[in-house]
Amino acid sequence: MIEFAVAGLSDPVQATVPWLSLSILVPIGGALLIPFIPDQGEGKQIRWYALIVTLITFLITVAAYLTGYDPSLSGLQLFERVSWLPEIGLTWTVGADGLSMPLILLTSFITSLACLAAWPVTFKPRLFFFLLLAMDGGQIAVFAVQDMLLFFLAWELELLPVYLLLAIWGGKKRQYAATKFILYTAGSSLFILLAALAMGFFGGGTPSFEYTALAAKDFGSGFQLLCYAGLLIAFGVKLPIVPLHTWLPDAHGEATAPVHMLLAGILLKMGGYALLRFNCELLPAAHAQFAPLLIVLGVVNIIYAALTSFAQRNLKRKIAYSSISHMGFVLIGIGSFSVLGSSGAMLQMISHGLIGASLFFLVGATYDRTHTLLLDEMGGIGQKMRIMFALWTVCALASLALPGMSGFVSELMIFAGFATDEAYTLPFRVVICGLAAVGVVLTPVYLLSMLREIFFGKEKAELASHTNLVDAEPREVYIIGCLLVPIIGIGLYPRLMTDSFSSSIEALVSRDVTAMEQLTKPTAPLIRGQSTVPAILRAPNLGTPTPK
């Protein structure tokens, strides 16, 4: 049995203003009012209304951060609790710490830009923006709630809007992509429900699903391993982890630009956040044994997805596999037992959210002009679309982790954190870093070759016949500019973001390290421990954890 102190999960700071509840209820309430908004049929009033609601939501989250959040504290802040169904221990409990506050800000920020990106939508605009606002509230709830059953409900709430946005406004294979998405995500979420019920009713004490209560429960190692495995499958689908990733290229291949931004910018981050919140924070004994598997899966993500992206001729699918590759670094950071590596994973999620949203928006803008996604049918449009080419170039350089961009800082932190993590043997660290570096090398190869095929060379006859090969319009420049400001800002001054979650990450890693050190017979053979580790994999003079 693993015993540890509840670090960073006690003594929550109460909210003086219910900012988090407002950030959830405003977009959901705004969505419910859309049927009553007068409109002349073109959706103009609906678009402006939805944009105002998303901007208000963004301002609420900013106000929450500026007035009620202290980055130096590791525990919960902006805490609200209202009894809901006390018979089964269910309460409306919301709060924020370093794991959730940055992602809440990211969600409201990207959703407001996605709403602006949806300006050309004229087919059923009332339903489209209703779903977009409902998705905004559901995604913020995923990061803000502090009750595992509420988390499950919020997790399910955002699935239906995504399904309908794909099925109604997607491409030719939209029904297939939407059905595959709902089967993967809804099916895997069953593991979340089972784990929530098991953790809420077992482990001693009064039945409760609040994170603070679950962290204080006394779960056996076997119980933790079982729950961890189920949650890893559920969150691995959303991250996604290879081989649970196949829904993502299909979804991105059929989605519209604003839905792209929400998928890449926010949806994938829900999986990474949930791994940190539940698998690492609430199940530390199991995490100590599963961590090497996360590292290996991260490397598989990086290399497999990078190679697959290199071979893609469809622009959307190429960027989709690039996203999967970049999320592999998040797995390596989560699997490390270092503050630097885990902080890098958190920063990588934020960085990829911004960069992924920008790239997919540009994919949609380019398709609106060329009416093709096949690289073989593109080429030579750089002379006619110079501003668009400049935007593409800057965003691609950010994706390949150019120094001065946020991606460079996050990947460097992950590499440095894992390379210096003495919880793993030196040969294992060398092999993993070497393999992950292959993905770093492949990224500029497929991204720069993609730019060459789109913008350079001789213009195809089919494209030359198009009269709408116009350059980027002010709305598009504004959206990319808004995304590039934090990308470059974080790249030049990382503390702009890392200070917001460093205290919570330190508490989380301390908790996991304590659990690892108390393992007397670790089943993970590549972690330093007793007995089962082969001598060739042991680093010399690293000592042996003190048995309990």
UniProtKB/Swiss-Prot annotation:
One of its GO terms (molecular function) is NADH dehydrogenase (ubiquinone) activity. InterPro entries: NADH_Q_OxRdtase_chain4 (IPR022997), NADH_Q_OxRdtase_chainM/4 (IPR010227), NADH_UbQ_OxRdtase (IPR003918), ND/Mrp_TM (IPR001750). It comes from the Bacteria. Its EC number is 7.1.1.-. One of its GO terms (biological process) is ATP synthesis coupled electron transport. GO terms for cellular component: plasma membrane-derived thylakoid membrane. It is a multi-pass membrane protein. The chain crosses the membrane at residues 17-37, 48-68, 103-123, 127-147, 149-169, 181-201, 222-242, 256-276, 290-310, 327-347, 348-368, 389-409, 430-450, 477-497. It is found in: Cellular thylakoid membrane. Its main location: membrane. It catalyses: a plastoquinone + NADH + (n+1) H(+)(in) = a plastoquinol + NAD(+) + n H(+)(out); a plastoquinone + NADPH + (n+1) H(+)(in) = a plastoquinol + NADP(+) + n H(+)(out). Keywords: Membrane, NAD, NADP, Plastoquinone, Quinone, Thylakoid, Translocase, Transmembrane, Transmembrane helix. Belongs to the complex I subunit 4 family. NDH-1 shuttles electrons from NAD(P)H, via FMN and iron-sulfur (Fe-S) centers, to quinones in the respiratory chain. The immediate electron acceptor for the enzyme in this species is believed to be plastoquinone. Couples the redox reaction to proton translocation (for every two electrons transferred, four hydrogen ions are translocated across the cytoplasmic membrane), and thus conserves the redox energy in a proton gradient. PANTHER family: NAD(P)H-QUINONE OXIDOREDUCTASE CHAIN 4, CHLOROPLASTIC, NADH-UBIQUINONE OXIDOREDUCTASE CHAIN 4. This is NAD(P)H-quinone oxidoreductase chain 4. It comes from Synechococcus sp. (strain CC9902). The gene is ndhD.
